[in-house]
Amino acid sequence: MNSIKNGFFLCMIFLLWCHVDSGVSIDPFSHSHSLNTECVMKPPRSSETKGLLQFSRSLEDDSDEEWKIDGNGFIREMAQRIQLHQGNIYSFSAWVKLREGNDKKVGVVFRTENGRLVHGGEVRANQECWTLLKGGIVPDFSGPVDIFFESENRGAKISAHNVLLKQFSKEEWKLKQDQLIEKIRKSKVRFEVTYENKTAVKGVVISLKQTKSSFLLGCGMNFRILQSQGYRKWFASRFKITSFTNEMKWYATEKARGQENYTVADSMLKFAEDNGILVRGHTVLWDNPKMQPSWVKNIKDPNDVMNVTLNRINSVMKRYKGKLTGWDVVNENLHWDYFEKMLGANASTSFYNLAFKIDPDVRLFVNEYNTIENTKEFTATPIKVKKMMEEILAYPGNKNMKGAIGAQGHFGPTQPNLAYIRSALDTLGSLGLPIWLTEVDMPKCPNQAQYVEDILREAYSHPAVKGIIIFGGPEVSGFDKLTLADKDFNNTQTGDVIDKLLKEWQQKSSEIQTNFTADSDNEEEEVSLLHGHYNVNVSHPWIANLSTSFSLEVTKEMDQDQVIRVVISA
C-alpha cells in the first residue's frame, strides 16, 4: 500500500496498550512555554493513570522497536484501531524524536475506515532530544481510525514516548475553555476604602464601568461604509477595531504608476477615528503575483521593481505612521513569492526591516491563511509560519522589531477541528509574540453560527491570542460569506452570535456594596474583572460629600493579591 501523501511518509503506530475514555484529566489547555518550545533530554513522566490511549518507548536504551517509514513509503505494521464517536473532541499528544536528522517535521495522522486521512498536528523533531507533538481530531463520523506518524523524511525512524489520546465531550471542552478564560482574561482585584487614619469606611458603594477592553473582537470594513449611513451606525455601535479589506492595498491606492490616491482609505480612517475605532493596516505589500497593480505586473526589470516597491513602502507607511495598530507587511509570503523571484530570497525580510525603520512602534505581522483552519495545509503550516517569523527577526537590524502573527482564519463550511486549532496556536504562541485572527469567515452553511462561535471561543480561550477580526458585515456591505445582518440591519443567526460574544467579552458595569459591619477595622471587597481600562467611583449612600473617582487599568500582570487602596479625606 503506497503511503506517500504530499511528500510525507506515513508510519502506523503499533499500540501495545490503549484505552480511550471521557474526562478532563489530560490537559491540552496547558500552555507551558517551556514544554512548547524546549527539546528535552528526557520527557516528563505523565501524571495520567487512566482514560488514555498510551504507548511509550523505553528511555533506558535503544533496543526497543521504532516506527520505521519505509524508503518506498509503504506501511509496514498493522495497528490496533481506536473507535471515535461523532460529537466528541479528541486531543493527542506525544513526545517524539528521530533516530537520524534534525529539525524535521513529524506529524500525527488519523486514517478513517474509507481511507480518508485527517492530519492532526505537527512539530519539528530532532535526534538528540524529545519534542512535544500536540494535536487532535473532531470527527464528523462515528467509527474506527488508525493512527499514524508522518514525516517529511523518507526512511525516517521515529521514537515516541507518552503517546496519549483523550476524549472530551463538547461540554467538557467548553468547561475547560471557560476555566482558562477566567484565568487568562481576568484578574482578581480587591478594593480597600479607608479614612486617612486608616480606619475602614463602612457601607461604601464602588461603581465600576469598563471604558476599554484589552481584548478586541473587531470586524473588517470596505468602501461601502462611506455610502451607507445604516452601515456606519451598525458598525460604530459594535466594534472598536477594524481593518480595510482592500482600500489600503497597493492596487487600490496606485492604479496607475505615480498616481497615488488615498482618498477612500483616508475617508474610512477618518470615520474610524471619529468613532474611536482602531485600525489594523492591511496590507503594505502582497506576495501574490496576481495581486500586484496591473502596471507593476508589466515591469520586467528587477531594479525597476525594487524602485517602485520601495516607493510604495515609504508612501503608505509614512502616510499612516502612528495611526495604525499594526501592519501586514508582506501578505501571504509563504504561499507566494513574487518579490523573492523578482528581487531575491531576502526580499520579504528586508522589507520588514524597512518597515521597522519607518515605524518602529507598530506591530509588523506575518499574515497567512490555512495555518489554523486547514489541517491539510502544506505550505503555511504553524511550524513554517513560526520559522518565517524567526527568519525575519534574525535579519540584521530586526532584533527589536515588534513582530506578530496573523492567522487569517478562512474556514470551510464544516465542523472546525478545535483540538488542531489549539495545537496550532500553541506552536505559533511559542514565539512569545501576539497572535491575531485577522480575517475570520466561513461560507454559508446550516451550522455556520455554531461553527463560528466554536472558532471564536477557541481563540479567545488561548493566552497567545490578543484579538480577532472577522470579515463580515450587514448585507449592504457585500460580505457574501459572513452576513451578520439583513438589508434592514436585522441580525442573522451568526450576527446574534457576534453580538452575544461582544457583550460577554465586555465587563458589565457593576456596583460593589461593601458590608455594613462595625466590628472590622479593614474591609476589602474582591471582584474578578476582565482586563482593560475602568472608571471607578467610590461613594456613600448617605454621606453626600464622600465621593471620589479614578481610572484603573486591570492587566494580566497584576498580582493576584492586588489591593486597590482608596483613601477618603474626612
Curated annotation (Swiss-Prot):
It catalyses: Endohydrolysis of (1->4)-beta-D-xylosidic linkages in xylans. Residues 1-23 form the signal peptide. It comes from the Eukaryota. Residues 202-501 form the GH10 domain. The active site is at E332 (proton donor), E439 (nucleophile). Pathway: Glycan degradation; xylan degradation. Its EC number is 3.2.1.8. One of its GO terms (molecular function) is endo-1,4-beta-xylanase activity. Glycans are attached at N197, N261, N307, N346, N490, N515, N537, N545. Pfam families: Glyco_hydro_10. One of its GO terms (biological process) is xylan catabolic process. Keywords: Carbohydrate metabolism, Glycoprotein, Glycosidase, Hydrolase, Polysaccharide degradation, Signal, Xylan degradation. The GH10 domain binds to xylan. Belongs to the glycosyl hydrolase 10 (cellulase F) family. Binds to and hydrolyzes insoluble and soluble xylan substrates. This is Endo-1,4-beta-xylanase 5-like. It comes from Arabidopsis thaliana. The lineage of its organism: Eukaryota, Viridiplantae, Streptophyta, Embryophyta, Tracheophyta.
